[in-house]
Amino acid sequence: MAATRIQPSTREIFTTLEYGPVPESHACALAWLDTHNRLLGHYVNGMWLKPEHRNPAPCQDPITGENLASCLQAEAEDISAAVEAARITFKTWSQLPGTARGQHLTRLAKVIQKHQRLLWTLESLVTGRAVREVRDGDIPLAQQLLHYHALQAHAQDSALADWEPLGVIGLILPTSFSFLDMMWRVCPALAMGCTVVALVPPSFPTPLLLAQLAGELGSFPGILNVVCGPVSLGPVLASQPGVQKVAFCGAVEEGRALRQTLAGRGATLGLALGTESLLLLTDSADVDSAVEGVVDAVWSDRSLGGLRLLIQESVWDEAMKRLQARMAQIRSGKGLDGAVDMGARGAAARDLAQSFVDEAQSQGGQVFQAGDMPSNSPFFSPTLVSGLPPAAPCAQAEVPWPVVMASPFRTVKEALALANGTPRGGSASVWSERLGQALELGYGLQVGTVWINAHGLRDPAVPTGGCKESGSSWHGGPDGLYEYLQLLGTPYRESFLCESLNYDTFGLAVSSSLPSGPETGPSPAPPYGLFVRGRFQSPGTQSSRPIKDSSGKVSSYVAEGGAKDIRGAVEAAHQAAPGWGAQSPRARASLLWALAAALERRKQVLAAQLERHGAAPTVAETEVELSVRRLQTWATRVQDQGQTLQVTGLRGPVLRLREPLGVLAVVCPDEWPMLAFVSLLAPALAHGNAVVLVPSGSCPLLALEACQDIAALFPAGLVNVVTGDRDHLTRCLALHQDVQAMWYFGSAQGSQFVEWASAGNLKPVWVNRDFPRAWDVEVQGSEQELSLHAARTKALWLPMGD
């Protein structure tokens, strides 16, 4: 009796041309786990730590459910030990010449190349991602990151001579992010002289392997320390003494909670939130190429999240038909199968996608899925949702992997309104064969990265980040380096947490000015009004507050602004912002020059005003002269705020754009009332922002005097100055959801409140934590730090080829 033939014959294979399995062996990954007896701990200071009495968490194959190993979950003392090791190593690592650090990173890149099979096998095995994406994408890019940042370290001593490393960096990664996301943040931190403590999920041991490879280089084992534990331990890591910055990747609500928890603790916070991306398909696009772009964006295991797809109505039917046909060809299977397009992400990701699809159907959406999957399957079919009303909750919610939510649009203006109408601003691609239309959409999208006729391109030299609720931190390119640097001489960031600060009542108890007796001198001048919408006007409270001179006598009155006045000022700024942002650099520069000339003509009056408030004559004259010079400095720099070309390893240029933040709130310090006001106003205007300012509390008259010239030169509503109780106005601005960024220079309690309140719309904030700033020193008053905070970066990719 003939044996039963299981495998197809060669003729059948060439007739059907069906895919067959191309399995990769996971023997090397299992062998590495066996060397640890299938029990992993933490990697700290070049050693494996397996403390007793720790709860183990399983590390499972997300497809088969097989228990591959167990990983001990960290507790507070484990994190403290890792931070201490990083802090001690920082003292020597940061003092090394940049050349030596660059050589160390190059050696690490060679070690990764040597052990790349182990890395991509382990990563694919434990995450379920398609092995070809990890092997052909993640590992080569990780090596490129190390080589690029090694070169940046070589140039640090000359190109970044005025900057110094921050210190110990805390990195928090959730389960949905890969080891490559860790590399994007670890490489610039190490290159600039920082050391890293990473908190990673216990179910993903690849970061532990990476730390082991770095530790085995021998010279500086404590530069990269990895502890395993849930995201809930993030506040424990962030609050450790010595941690100067926390980089967090994860969900929006987790980032919002961490922002509030870290308020007042001294460490800066860099957020990269959400995973959704956007794709705009116009009627002039190559539809087949755009469909492949959708596959790359969400169904190729390159992306971590879902996709919001906007299709022009004239090609809606054709695009949807071709997309559904392409979905039927996508192969799901084990990640270690080389012929698989899409693997599995585990039960949590599958349940989240199913919940979103069920909710979308209940709200009127139409669902198309390529193939049926059993309810107990670890895989989730590629899913296309359409027909949702624009007001449906799912139409505004973040789209999870592997779901595409499609919506039609008619015009470019409508496409921008739909695309920018969500609180997320991560990445997007524009598909159009008309370059002018593509650039118009690319410039108009409120996101951090835009690809033209491509999706998901990455290069170490190109900055990647986001805006709005996607976070405001950057990695890659020069922007990623500044995330881990501070100006020379910046005070050490210690915790300034005020435990007694009541967030519910801060700024609500407005101090009242009681009569102090009969006036014996000449009557003070009539009170200044609030400067809103280009003119002085009475405050909503119809009250004023006294301003005293150096002798303690009342010299004048200013308006007592409140919440109603802040609302009006922010509304006026929003109306003026689009027009000012669209102005050419030459037009903005000419107005800044004109303001400098106007203040110079009135320098004697302004200096006399400063003298009445206690400034020595020479100091007052110097402050006015520096203010004029500061305006002139930023007027000359306006031309440098445009786009620059970035060289990458791919064919085609990348435009690095510097875009306005929008409406910027600024609370000025009490010291240097004229110079600080101008030093903060000038870069904000130079970069195209509209501004709402609270001037010096002790001497606001100089700012109001300058507003007389601002009213004659600048568009109405572009600059708004509100006087009153600083804490109360700070509260109103920090809690305002339409303020898109905020700078605060005041008390430690005010800095803490601003950081806490910014979690509402996750606006980027810059606070001084009660440390005085030398505004008369050029480096602190007009240098690159102000420019970095005054605008956001957008990378616009223009790849070439068919």
Curated annotation (Swiss-Prot):
Similarity field: Belongs to the aldehyde dehydrogenase family.
InterPro entries: Ald_DH/histidinol_DH, Ald_DH_C, Ald_DH_N, Aldehyde_DH, Aldehyde_DH_dom
UniProt protein name: Aldehyde dehydrogenase family 16 member A1
Gene name of the encoded protein: Aldh16a1
GO MF entries: aldehyde dehydrogenase (NAD+) activity
Assembly and interaction partners: Interacts with SPG21.
Annotated region (Disordered), positions in chain: 513-554
Superkingdom classification of source: Eukaryota
Pfam families: Aldedh
